[in-house]
């Protein structure tokens, strides 16, 4: 059944690519430009450095603090990429999978330079976003280690090679990895555009619109896009006419969740189980968004709009905050329901 469904979806996707070829081409170009201008400059240098450190054996001891620091600085899918050396024969324990998920956070360089400075036009907004992402990631790592007693040890020793050879191999590995990331970004940019062109987006967002009548449609579309492809959602958030506090909180949610695109990128490097990965990341994103909303006044003393705060503004902010909560819970419920169905089928077999 799963195979037939996958074949049907692939055939449908190909048909939509033909029917909406101009829009799909524009979306692919947009995804490539986002990768070229934002993702590749922030990730490639760190991919080279982390690859070299791994080949030098710096992470063989499984030092969690060093792993966390490298993953946080390099950005997603750095967590999955760094944890790949702890998988044995293409498989990983549940705790290691959750640890890789917790370490998949967006690069601070992207948040500061691309999102806060370029998209929001307010560099100071990066402070509460980074703090909330850091606190949510630390909480998630602590949970993974406490709940599963994660013990990290490299499954294979790196071969002894001259430093020059290791450096060359690190560059080759980093370029290959960043090109794989490009493929995932372009695919999801095109998928989002096709969903919009076919009108399916309004259908998918209808339950949320009915639940929250005052919800801004553009904000709903931005968050939905971000849950598929994080950079697309971040770009859409930057153009919204919402208070800076709300946009920052929504951004923090998306950056800690990462979206399906980063989940797909993680699969390129590490054997994560999506039925564990996605609910865990949804909760991490929800926690990050709430933390950002709470600490924003303490970290950022500017104001996002002129004039007094009206009841309408407070109501819109409350609805948007509720939307973050609803999206996370609905997404978690859907993924958990799917996981439960899969589990029952496996037990029957």
What name fits each language-model region?
Residues 171, 175-252:
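Transmembrane helical segments that form the transport core of multi-pass membrane transport proteins
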Residues 149-173, 305-311, 315, 339-349:
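Intrinsically disordered, low-complexity non-transmembrane regions of multi-pass membrane transporters
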Residues 62-120, 222-240, 247-270, 278-282:
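Alpha-helical membrane segments and immediately flanking helix-loop junctions
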């Amino acid at each position: 059944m799963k195979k037939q469904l996958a074949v049907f979806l692939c055939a449908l996707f190909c048909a939509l690519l033909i029917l909406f070829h101009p829009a799909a081409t524009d979306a692919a170009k947009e995804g490539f430009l986002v990768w070229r201008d934002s993702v590749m400059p922030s990730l490639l240098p760190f991919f080279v450095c982390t690859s070299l450190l791994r080949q030098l054996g710096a992470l063989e001891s499984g030092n969690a603090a060093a792993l966390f620091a490298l993953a946080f600085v390099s950005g997603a899918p750095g967590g999955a990429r760094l944890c790949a050396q702890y998988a044995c024969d293409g498989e990983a324990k549940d705790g290691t999978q959750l640890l890789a998920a917790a370490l998949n956070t967006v690069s601070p360089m992207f948040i500061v330079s691309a999102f806060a400075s370029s998209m929001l036009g307010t560099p100071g907004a990066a402070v509460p976003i980074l703090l909330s992402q850091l606190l949510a990631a630390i909480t998630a790592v602590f949970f993974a280690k406490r709940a599963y007693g994660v013990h990290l040890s490299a499954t294979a020793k790196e071969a002894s090679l001259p430093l020059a050879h290791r450096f060359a191999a690190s560059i080759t590995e980093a370029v290959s990895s960043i090109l794989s990331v490009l493929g995932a970004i372009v695919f999801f940019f095109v998928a989002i555009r096709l969903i919009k062109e076919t009108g399916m987006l309004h259908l998918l967002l209808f339950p949320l619109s009915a639940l929250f009548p005052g919800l801004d449609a553009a904000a709903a579309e931005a968050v939905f896009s971000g849950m598929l492809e994080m950079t697309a959602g971040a770009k859409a958030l930057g153009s919204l006419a919402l208070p800076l506090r709300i946009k920052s909180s929504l951004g923090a949610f998306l950056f800690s969740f990462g979206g399906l695109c980063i989940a797909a990128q993680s699969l390129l490097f590490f054997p994560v189980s999506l039925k564990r990965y996605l609910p865990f990341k949804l909760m991490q994103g929800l926690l990050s968004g709430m933390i950002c909303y709470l600490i924003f006044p303490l970290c950022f003393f500017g104001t996002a709009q002129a004039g007094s705060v009206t009841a309408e503004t407070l109501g819109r902010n409350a609805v948007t905050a509720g939307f973050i909560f609803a999206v996370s819970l609905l997404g978690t419920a859907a993924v958990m329901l799917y996981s439960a169905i899969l589990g029952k089928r496996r037990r029957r077999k």
